[in-house]
Amino acid sequence: MRSMLAISAIVAAVFAVPASATVIDLSTLNRAGSAQLVDGALQLTHTSKVSNASGVSGAGWLTQGVSTTSSFSTSFSFSLKGDDSGKMADGIALAFQNVGTNVTGVGGGDVGYWNIGGSGSSAVGSVIRSWTHNEYGLSTNGKVQGLDAAPFNLGASNNVTGSQTVSYNAVTHELSMSGIFTDLSTGLSYNVSDTATVDLSAKFGSTMYVGFTGGTAGTDADQRITSFSLTSAVPEPETYAMLLAGLGMIGFTARRRQAQK
C-alpha cells in the first residue's frame, strides 16, 4: 500500500511540473523574402509606396523544429500599419510547416501563407487578413479564404495592434486561438477566438517549423511581429527520467521486502 502511495506521489509530482515558457529573441529567427529586423521586431513587409501587383512576401522561422507529438502553446503580438493613403494590405499569419526555414509563400492576399516553399496546402496556422478581406481565423490547409469576419475594418483602420495565443492539445488534436485586436484609429479593442481539429503529427511528422509570414501587393503595410514566446505543456525529458528512476527504486524495494518475509 505504501509503495502504491509513493508511486502516486511521484506521478502527481511529474504532472504538477509547471509549463516552461521560452521568450523568443526575434533576431534569432531565420528570415526569408522581404522580412528584416527593425527596432527589435520582425518586420515581415514594409510600406514601400511602390505598387507590386505580383505580390511580396516575407517570413521568419524558428531554426529548430518543434515536436508535434507534445502539447504546446505559443503567444505573439503584432502591429499592422498603413501609410494612410488607402486601405493597408494584406495581412500576416502564424504558420506551422515542415518545408524548411528559408521559405515563404505567395504574397498579396495569400499573406505568404499559401504555397510555402512551393508545397501547396501544407501550412497550418492562424491567419489575419486586412485590405478588403478583413478576416481572421485558424487554417489547417494552407488556405486563407473562408475565415471569420473581423470585428472591424482592418484595412481601413490602417493602424492595428494585437496579440494571440495559439494552443495545441496533442491528445485531442484540438488547435485553439484566443486574442485581442485593437483599432488604434478609434482606440477600441475586440476579443477574437477560433478552434479547429488537426493532427499535426500525421500532417508533418514528428517535428515542424514554427514562424510567421506576411504579404502585400498593390497596397502595402508595415507588418511586424513585436513579441513571441513558446510554452511547453509537458514535462521535460529529465523529469520523465526521474519518474522512471523513482518507479524502479520503489519496485526494487517492494520486491526485496517480499523476499525477506
Feature locations, PLM:
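Positively charged n-region of N-terminal signal peptides that target proteins for export
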Residues: 1-4, 236, 255-261
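Bacterial N-terminal signal peptides
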Residues: 8-14
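Ser/Thr-centric signal marking residues that sit
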Residues: 9, 165, 239
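Hydrophobic aliphatic residue packing
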Residues: 11, 60, 234-236, 250
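Sec/Tat signal peptide C-region and signal peptidase I cleavage site
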Residues: 17-21
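Polar, low-complexity loop segments and adjacent catalytic/binding residues used for recognizing
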Residues: 22-232
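A short, hydrophobic C-terminal helix/tail in secreted or cell-surface proteins
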Residues: 236-255
